[in-house]
Every structure is written in structure tokens, then in C-alpha cells.
Amino acid sequence: MNKQRVTLNCDMGESFGNWKMGSDELVMPWVDMANIACGFHASDPSVMSKTVALAKHYKVKIGAHPGYQDLVGFGRRSIPHTPAQISEIVLYQVGALKAVCQYHDVPLHYVKPHGALYNDMMESEAIFRAICEAVSIFGIPLMILATSDNQHYLDIADIYDVPLLFEAFADRQYQEDGKLTPRSQANAVYHQPEDIYNQALQIATYGSVNTANGTRLSLEADTICVHGDNPESIALVQRISQAIAKM
């Protein structure tokens, strides 16, 4: 069993303008960490400010959730950038959220890239290094995917003096190498509440997941990513939170 209780993190602040995404006010009480969008894939200055204030109210740790500049594609499309450009877009977005946090007199605790930027970070050492370089400016941890080879990422991040937080996903199918099944493939995302609940508790209790072919894979995860996009999923997040709190 894990020695330390895992936390729950959730993507937040993804509305912008008149367009509403998620039910942050209903999910926030049940999570430990809020990954707040920074305006490129979603959010706007007003939404960022309101979401930071909401996290402060519930004493939830705030993380910056930078992505590619792609509102139409919700940041899920990979956009070619040089390593220098990757560092720049991360600096720009994290800096914006840090300023909002300072306005509300709360700290910014970590950075977790979004969508395609997150996936590209896990696949490309050059992109991972570029993100580490940007995050090092803020002196806070970077959240990445827990895999079967966490040490590889730890060694690189150590060069930049960036602590790492490792996360696992409650609602995603895993491949044998510890990476997520691409969303383009069948069964990549779990939709049945019991499947999501069981995987979350397996991660929290045993530090493992069952892969697509049924193999048990060990994952050293500090936190579990959950989603609260509809009433059913909000109830599920509450259920997972209450179960983990009893461990």
C-alpha cells in the first residue's frame, strides 16, 4: 500500500466568455488540487480570477494548466513549436496565473500541462526539457504522468532543479508501457462510474492499474486526476474523495 494518501486533482476554470465548461463550484469541495486553465486552450482573465478565488475558499492547492493556443481544438491538437517557443508559451501562461494568485493572496503550487502539450511532453525529451526550463523560473513542481519509468524524468528534471509530481488517471485506459491509450483508440476513456471508481481505488490502495490486456502495472503516483464535467461524474468524484479519506 502507498505510505502517503494520494490526492485528487481536477482540471478547472475551462469556461470562457459566455461559454461554460464544467461545474467547478460543485467539484472544488471534493478535490485537493485544481489545475486552472490559463487562457490558451480555455479560460479568460475573469474565469481565472473566479476560479482562483473558489480554490482559495475551499483551501485547494492551485496549479497552472498551460496548453497550446487552440481554443477551437480545446488544446487537444499538437501544434509544432521549437523548444524555445514551448518555454515561452509556458512562461506566459504560468506567469499570468501566478499574477492572479498574487492578487488573491494565495500561492501557485505547481504546473500541469494540458492535453496535447502534456502528451507531447511525455513523448519528447526536448519538449519536457523546455517545460522544465520554464517551470524552474517559478520554483514549483511540475506534474507529469506516472509511468513504469519515473526515474528517467526525475533525472532530467533534477538538472533544472524542478521537483516532479506524478499523477495517474482514474478514467483512462493504460497501455503495457504505462502510457495512456490514445483517445483515438476504442476504450481509451472509461465512462462507466464503477470502472472509474475501481481504478481510482486501486491506484490509491495498491499503486497499480490493470492495463488494456489485463496485466497489473505498478505506478508510483502522488495524485489521481478526476473529472467533474456532468452531474454523474461530480457524484463520482465525491464518492472517490470520501473513500480515499477513509484510508
Swiss-Prot record:
GO terms for biological process: carbohydrate metabolic process. One of its GO terms (molecular function) is ATP binding. Transmembrane segments: none annotated. Pfam families: LamB_YcsF (PF03746). It is an enzyme of class 3 (hydrolase). It comes from the Bacteria. Keywords: ATP-binding, Hydrolase, Nucleotide-binding. It catalyses: 5-oxo-L-proline + ATP + 2 H2O = L-glutamate + ADP + phosphate + H(+). Its EC number is 3.5.2.9. Catalyzes the cleavage of 5-oxoproline to form L-glutamate coupled to the hydrolysis of ATP to ADP and inorganic phosphate. PANTHER family: 5-OXOPROLINASE SUBUNIT A, UNCHARACTERIZED PROTEIN YBGL-RELATED. Belongs to the LamB/PxpA family. Forms a complex composed of PxpA, PxpB and PxpC. This is 5-oxoprolinase subunit A. It comes from Vibrio vulnificus (strain CMCP6). The gene is pxpA.
